[in-house]
Amino acid sequence: MENAKMTSLIAQYPLVEDLIALKETTWFNPGTTSLAEGLPYVGLTAQDVQDAHARLARFAPYLAKAFPETAATGGIIESELAIIPAMQQRLEKEYGQKISGELLLKKDSHLPISGSIKARGGIYEVLAHAEKLALEAGLLTTEDDYSVMLSPEFRQFFSQYSIAVGSTGNLGLSIGIMSACIGFKVTVHMSADARAWKKAKLRSHGVTVVEYEEDYGVAVEQGRKAAQSDPNCFFIDDENSRTLFLGYAVAGQRLKAQFAQQGRVVDADHPLFVYLPCGVGGGPGGVAFGLKLAFGDNVHCFFAEPTHSPCMLLGVYTGLHDAISVQEIGVDNLTAADGLAVGRASGFVGRAMERLLDGLYTLDDRTMYDMLGWLAQEEGIRLEPSALAGMAGPQRVCRSTDYQQMHAFSAEQLNHATHLVWATGGGMVPEEEMAQYLAKGR
């Protein structure tokens, strides 16, 4: 971006200066609206999410047999909630900031099949595509027991089709493993920052991995191009996919049920704050949408990004969305949080969710590593760096009187709050890789 343009951008949007300087930055969104007002801009409805629920229920018998680790939950891919009081105390001690209310961790990091939040959206979109093909071919009705899809006839049928996706790692892992299981030929286009073990795991499932020296945007573009030349190839578009988004959105109702089981109340007097790591935006966007449908105006969602990859904060804050990249403001998009190393946000997600987000913030890789170490020490829970992005959120909210006044929160409401940090990945990180992560924390 030329100097004059940059000067005028900073004059209009002063926080851009902090993003350029790679400072840890918090932006509380002055443009939030009620769910009723913001919902029409999403372009998807509660019925769409209900349909996704129903589809996953139809596939449950298939998943229970195809992936024995899901048998205990009857083929439903869901993660547990952990209350983390020792981590809450450690954060208060390290940062000198009391966290009012209770701190919880949503362990999507330990979801079955692929060990990340992407087991929600990625697997859902592959299943939705398989169902569509099988229904159109007359091989299946929605009344059938979907475990018939494990038969050789079905695998033979699916083998004439292929799937392509561009990914920094976890989405590729979910889509690759699921597609290979169904019988699709699958190619994952991986960006330079993808971890070697994720590529190796995919190849062990018979997935074709194409590696690029460039970043995420290039991998997605190449994947899209390759798929265009083959009518039997379906490209899963992480930047624009409504189907992926709905796969994530199912998490809202599921969390509501988990809270009900625990007797945990969410209402005006007991607000829920949720902190979601954000890369291109599909995962956190879909989950936040589902949470809003489940809890309405009593849930407050925040996206968390690395200081080196603040694409969604930049896009939503300036209103430029996918018309601007972090590279254009001189930020390098190089971060240890490989799942969040995205330079240009999804325009679909930014525009859909900009009224329903309470804020976005950035944190340094160093901060992620520190918190990774503390969580392992205090709670015995091991995550990958990007999964800690949400852990910095509760202090930012509890520290900001401006934000509390903006939403007229009383001290009593905050004392009754639930702070939920969404842990997005790390359950399948190899031991030696995890040891390197732990060595970097203080």
UniProtKB/Swiss-Prot annotation:
Root EC class: lyase
Listed cofactors: pyridoxal 5'-phosphate
CDD domains: D-Ser-dehyd
Keyword entries, A-Z: Lyase, Pyridoxal phosphate
Residue stretches spanning the membrane: none
GO MF terms, alphabetically ordered: D-serine ammonia-lyase activity; hydro-lyase activity; pyridoxal phosphate binding
Modified residues (N6-(pyridoxal phosphate)lysine): 118
Reaction(s) catalysed (UniProt annotation): D-serine = pyruvate + NH4(+)
Any single GO BP term: isoleucine biosynthetic process
EC number: 4.3.1.18
Iron as UniProt keyword: no
Assembly and oligomerization: Monomer.
Family, per entry: Belongs to the serine/threonine dehydratase family. DsdA subfamily.
Protein name: D-serine dehydratase
